[in-house]
Amino acid sequence: MATLQAIKYSRGKLLVLDQLRLPHENHYDEVSTAEEAFDCIRSMRVRGAPAIAIVAALAHAVELHNGDCTATEPEEVIAHIEKRLDYLKESRPTAVDLSNAITLLKLATRAANLEGLAHPEAKEAILNTYIQTAEEILAKDLHNNTSIGSYGTAWLQQQYSASSEKPISVLTHCNTGSLATSGHGTALGIIRTLHSEGLLKHAYCTETRPYNQGSRLTSFELVFEGIPSTLITDSMAGALFNLHRERMNIGAVIVGADRVVRNGDTANKIGTYQLAVLARHHGVKFVVAAPTTSIDLETGNGSAIEIEERKREELTQISGAIVNEDGTVDTSKTARVAIADQRIGVWNPAFDVTPHELIDAIVTERGTVVKGADGKFDFSQVLPERLASVAARQL
């Protein structure tokens, strides 16, 4: 089955799908510098925690491959790389994948084997180490997403005895598919796997105001791949559970994550928290799908997560392609219109934090983590080394 690609990469060239033009136009921007990557991420032409990290890492790989670094001394080369990475880190501070990728790239670059090399060869070794590490981040993400899909499907099948005769329906929020990752997706990856195994009855997606990632992107992916699906507004979720849970066998809300902290509190797209509350009230499982790169063991709980706030116009204005009188869409014309009094005060956090108490399972590429008898998530089964390292530093 054909899938969408948000990122197209070959060494020395990076193309990023402009998701602001979807679903009406498929247009790829060439991203050749850290500045272009920063703007691409900040403007949300690319979004989704894994995709953000990949674009940042590969953009700098492209500029290094194409001769951006003029330094010759090994320490100066490393300093140049780290300065560019620190700049890119500020493009989306809530997404921990970006921070983790930058840490990995810095460590790998400093660990490059320079023994017996003169300065020109040492510089080349450092650059090659960076580029190869960035390319490995891309390849690993796709593998991880496929594993998340398998683990999540297995857990849901076990919870509901799902089968082709008794498929389940699910609700998802924001966009967590091929457009938010290197491919397949996290939460949407589980939905894809459920569908491919004949275990999915129906997928519901929220529009995800104010940026409409659900209506613009997730619905586009679901239709593109022929997955039975329905779009609802964010405010319809409670009514959906109340009126259709039994008839449609709605078993789970499946969401992604921009950051999961040590106790399981999860930062994700604004609106996630209220879905968790509704799911708990109606007896629907609430599942977070995230690679281990999105897990932040350094932060104890969600109160310490920095929440990005975005511009007021995202709530008071909206843009899109022109709809003709006969109902056809003219993608060559767009308009931006006001949908609120422009004088109204606006609060526009991009994310909220769902308390771990409302989460039933966190699905990673290494397995599904559930709460123990004490009501707490234990990440030792999927991140034993990182957890031990954090614990040792706290002694």
Swiss-Prot record:
It catalyses: 5-(methylsulfanyl)-alpha-D-ribose 1-phosphate = 5-(methylsulfanyl)-D-ribulose 1-phosphate. Catalyzes the interconversion of methylthioribose-1-phosphate (MTR-1-P) into methylthioribulose-1-phosphate (MTRu-1-P). Pathway: Amino-acid biosynthesis; L-methionine biosynthesis via salvage pathway; L-methionine from S-methyl-5-thio-alpha-D-ribose 1-phosphate: step 1/6. The record marks C174 as: Transition state stabilizer. GO terms for molecular function: S-methyl-5-thioribose-1-phosphate isomerase activity. InterPro entries: IF-2B-related, IF-M1Pi, IF_2B-like_C, Initiation_fac_2B_a/b/d, M1Pi_N, NagB/RpiA_transferase-like. One of its GO terms (cellular component) is nucleus. Keywords: Amino-acid biosynthesis, Cytoplasm, Isomerase, Methionine biosynthesis, Nucleus. One of its GO terms (biological process) is L-methionine salvage from methylthioadenosine. Gene3D superfamilies: translation initiation factor eif-2b, domain 1 (1.20.120.420), Translation initiation factor eif-2b, domain 2 (3.40.50.10470). This is Methylthioribose-1-phosphate isomerase. Its EC number is 5.3.1.23. It comes from Podospora anserina (strain S / ATCC MYA-4624 / DSM 980 / FGSC 10383) (Pleurage anserina). Its main location: cytoplasm. Transmembrane segments: none annotated. The keyword Magnesium does not apply. It holds the Pfam family IF-2B. Belongs to the eIF-2B alpha/beta/delta subunits family. MtnA subfamily. The active site is at D258. It is found in: Cytoplasm; Nucleus.
